[in-house]
UniProtKB/Swiss-Prot annotation:
Membrane topology (Extracellular): 1-5, 70-88, 148-185, 256-264
More info: The chimpanzee and gorilla orthologous proteins do not exist, their genes are pseudogenes.
Originating gene: VN1R4
Record carries keyword Transmembrane: yes
Effect of R58L: In allele VN1R4*4
Pfam families, alphabetized: V1R
Protein name in the entry: Vomeronasal type-1 receptor 4
GO CC, alphabetical: plasma membrane
Record-stated family: Belongs to the G-protein coupled receptor 1 family.
One GO process term, biological-process aspect: response to pheromone
Gene3D superfamilies tied to this protein: Rhodopsin 7-helix transmembrane proteins
Keyword Glycosyltransferase: no
Record InterPro entries: GPCR_Rhodpsn_7TM, Vmron_rcpt_1
Length: 301
């Protein structure tokens, strides 16, 4: 019983904190739009990242909290399919836009002699198309997911062997379940690898740039962190948060797919891991962008 209340508190806290953080960042960009300020090309990616995070939080955190409070059968089969589908789409777009953000950042900071330099002028023109393509791919990849989910009260049409908290997953074919888990995890693993490679390239570029600047003029060094250092720190924080949260989330999802009847602890822990990055990423963006931080905490003045 105690573990149940702990799970309720953690899921509810994650949901509330994540939603507030997402709204704060969105309001910041809305203020830019209303005042006519010119946005960077990557700001469009950030806005879609925040929307995807909000969708993932709303469709996972709220129903999971209600289920942890003991509310039963509040979603029918169609509701379960829709909520799970929207969560998967939001989760996928969150991963994809984070990967896109890393790619466009490394193109931005690359030197003229870098292998990324050829894309420097073309990349800003394709930001909107890249984000739209990310949404379309996530919608198509996850369209099979609702086929295996139903309401907890509807056990007549499929064999239920997975308790997913507020809904149930069906099917008793282990091979099919394993293939489904691998298919759904493949885009995540692909984005993980791509973002690690791109981010490591960016860190190397910034490190070489810092060494050249120090070599040219050591007398102008300031004790404050340089923009390159702040960019490097933001990359490392975002990549570390992304890799750790989604690696654990994928592992828990694979375990749930392979087990016949996962217990409530595994279900709640999987829910916590799945909304970990959507909860933390707005605050990572705040810490990396001084203008966002000043806007979101202006009430303290």
């Amino acid at each position: 019983m105690a573990s149940r209340y702990v799970a309720v508190g953690m899921i509810l806290s994650q949901t509330v904190v994540g939603v507030l953080g997402s709204f704060s960042v969105l309001l910041h960009y809305l203020s830019f739009y209303c005042t006519g300020c010119r946005l960077r090309s990557t700001d469009l990616i950030v806005k879609h990242l925040i929307v995807a995070n909000f969708l993932a939080l709303r469709c996972k955190g709220v129903p999971q909290t209600m289920a942890a409070f003991g509310v039963r059968y509040f979603l029918n089969a169609l509701g379960c399919k829709l909520v799970f589908y929207l969560h998967r789409v939001g989760r996928g777009v969150s991963i994809g836009t984070t990967c896109l953000l890393s790619v466009f950042q490394v193109i931005t900071v690359s030197s003229r002699k870098s292998r990324w330099a050829k894309l420097k002028e073309k990349a800003p023109k394709h930001v909107g198309f890249s984000v739209l393509l990310c949404w379309i791919v996530c919608m198509l990849v996850n369209i099979i997911f609702p086929m295996y989910v139903t309401g907890k009260w509807n056990y007549t049409n499929i064999t239920v062997n997975e308790d997913l908290g507020y809904c149930s997953g069906g099917g008793n074919n282990k091979i099919a379940q394993t293939l489904r888990a691998m298919l759904l995890s493949f885009p995540d693993v692909l984005c993980l690898g791509l973002m690690l490679w791109v981010s490591s390239s960016m860190v190397c570029i910034l490190h070489r740039h810092k060494q050249r600047v120090q070599h040219i003029d050591r007398s102008n060094l300031s004790p404050r962190a340089s923009p390159e250092n702040r960019a490097t720190q933001s990359i490392l924080i975002l990549v570390s948060t992304f890799v750790s949260s989604y690696t654990l989330s994928c592992l828990f999802q694979v375990c749930m797919a392979l087990l016949d009847n996962p217990n409530s602890l595994l279900v709640n822990t999987s829910a916590l891991m799945s909304v970990c990055f959507p909860t933390l990423s707005p605050f990572v963006l705040m810490s990396c962008d001084p203008s966002v931080y000043r806007f979101c905490f202006a009430w303290k003045r």
